[in-house]
A protein has these predicted regions:
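Intrinsically disordered, low-complexity segments enriched in serine/proline and basic residues
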Residues: 1, 5-15
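Metallo-beta-lactamase
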Residues: 33, 37-44, 49-56, 81, 89, 131-201, ...
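Conserved beta-strand hairpin/beta-sheet module of binuclear metal-dependent hydrolase folds
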Residues: 50-99, 210-225
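Hydrophobic/aromatic beta-strand patches that form the interior of the parallel beta-sheet core
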Residues: 62, 106-108, 127, 180-182, ...
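Active-site HxH/HxHxD metal-binding segment of metal-dependent hydrolases
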Residues: 90-187, 226, 277-302
Length: 334
C-alpha cells in the first residue's frame, strides 16, 4: 500500500463486525475515519469518539452512558451546568456536553475511583472530597493502564460492540486538574436549580451523594446499589478504610432525608434501566443489610462476581441487595 493512511483505511474496512451490535456499521467507520482530534499510534490524527448514548430522563437532566463502564450525569440550570463524574475517560466527553449545552459548567467527582475520575484530565478543575484525593496520586501511566483494563473487562463481560478503541479513545492525561474541596452540605446554585452534596462514606472514605432541588432525585453514585462494595482494603491509620458500622450510620442519615427526594439513581445502570431510577426499596434494603452485618445476623451467600470473569464472591444478602465486605472490617476501631 502507498502510505499509512491507505493501510489504516484497509485495516478498518476489514475489521470483523461483532455480533448483536446495536450500532450502525457505517457510523462506526465514520467515527474511526473522522476529522482530527487525537494522535494515533501511526502518527496521523484521528477523532476521539463522542458517540456516548445520553438520555434526558427529566427536564435538563441527562444520563450519559460511558459504554456500560459508568454513568455520568449532567444538570443544566438557567445560568450554568454541573457535570457529575467523568467516567473512565473514554472519548471526547467535552464534545458530548457541547451537544447538550453551551453553558459553562462545574465538574464534580462523586468519589475517587478511576471509573468516575478517569476523564478528569480533560478539565481544569475538579471538586472532590479531600478524603479521596489519594486516588489521584497514582502516575498518569498507571492510571491509563487501569482505565484501559477496566474498559476491556466491561467489553468482555457484556460481549458487545462499542464504538471506541482503548488505544485511540483512552489517552494518558497531560495534566492533573486543580482539586477543589467538596464538603458535606456544600451547595451549587446553577440558576433556579440547586445541587447539594452530602458525605456518605462506605464505598470509599470520600463518597458523596447529591440531592437535586429541581427533580427531587438523590444521585447516590456508588454509595448505594443492589451490588454494594464497601471500602475495606486500606490501612486504618491512613483514613483509607470504612467499616460497615460507619457506612451504616452514613446510610441511615441519607435514608432520614427522604422528605427531600422522591427517587434514587446510582452511577451504574447494571441493576436498573438506563435513565430510570433504582427501585424505591433499594436504599432501605442496603441499610438493613448493613445493620444485619453489624449485629451478626446477615445471610451470607456465594454469588457470581460481576467484576471478575468466571469467579464468585462471598456477600451478605438482604432482599435484592448484596454487600461485599471483609469480616475484619465490620466494626470501628475503639
Amino acid at each position: 500500500m502507498k502510505n499509512k493512511r491507505d493501510r489504516l483505511f484497509f485495516t478498518l474496512l476489514f475489521v470483523p463486525q461483532a455480533p448483536q451490535s446495536s450500532y450502525d456499521r457505517r457510523a462506526e467507520l465514520e467515527v474511526l475515519l473522522a476529522i482530527p482530534s487525537a494522535q494515533s499510534a501511526c502518527g496521523m490524527e484521528i477523532t476521539m469518539t463522542d458517540r456516548h448514548p445520553y438520555y434526558e430522563f427529566e427536564k435538563d437532566t441527562y444520563e450519559i452512558d460511558e459504554f456500560d463502564c459508568s454513568s455520568i450525569f449532567l444538570f443544566v440550570g438557567k445560568e450554568r451546568a454541573l457535570l457529575l463524574d467523568t467516567g473512565c475517560g473514554i472519548g471526547d466527553l467535552k464534545g458530548v456536553i457541547r451537544k447538550i449545552t453551551d453553558k459553562p459548567y462545574i465538574v464534580i467527582a462523586s468519589h475517587g475511583h478511576m471509573d468516575h475520575i478517569g476523564g478528569a484530565g480533560a478539565f481544569d478543575e475538579l471538586y472532590i472530597n479531600p478524603a479521596d484525593n489519594y486516588f489521584l496520586d497514582v502516575s498518569f501511566e498507571k492510571m491509563l493502564e487501569n482505565r484501559r483494563n477496566y474498559a476491556d473487562f466491561i467489553r468482555k463481560r457484556e460481549d458487545k460492540y462499542y464504538p471506541y478503541s482503548t488505544e485511540n479513545d483512552m489517552l494518558c492525561w497531560e495534566k492533573k486538574p486543580k482539586l477543589l474541596p467538596l464538603s458535606d452540605g456544600q451547595t451549587f446554585d446553577l440558576g433556579r436549580r440547586i445541587i447539594t452534596a452530602y458525605s456518605c462514606p462506605g464505598h470509599t472514605p470520600g463518597e458523596m451523594v447529591f440531592i437535586d432541588s429541581k427533580t427531587r432525585y438523590l444521585f447516590c453514585a456508588d454509595a448505594c446499589n443492589r451490588n454494594l462494595l464497601l471500602m475495606q482494603s486500606g490501612d486504618h491509620t491512613e483514613g483509607r478504610y470504612v467499616s460497615v458500622e460507619k457506612a451504616a450510620k452514613a446510610m441511615e442519615r441519607i435514608v432520614s432525608m427522604k422528605d427531600q427526594y422522591d427517587h434514587v439513581i446510582n452511577s451504574h445502570h447494571d441493576y436498573r434501566g438506563f435513565g430510570a431510577p433504582l427501585a424505591d426499596y433499594v436504599v432501605d434494603q442496603a441499610l438493613e443489610c448493613m445493620k444485619k452485618i453489624v449485629d451478626g445476623t446477615a445471610e451470607i451467600r456465594e454469588i457470581p462476581d460481576p467484576l471478575q470473569l468466571n469467579a464468585t464472591k462471598t456477600v451478605a444478602v438482604y432482599g435484592d441487595v448484596f454487600i461485599t465486605y471483609s469480616k475484619e472490617g465490620v466494626y470501628e476501631t475503639r
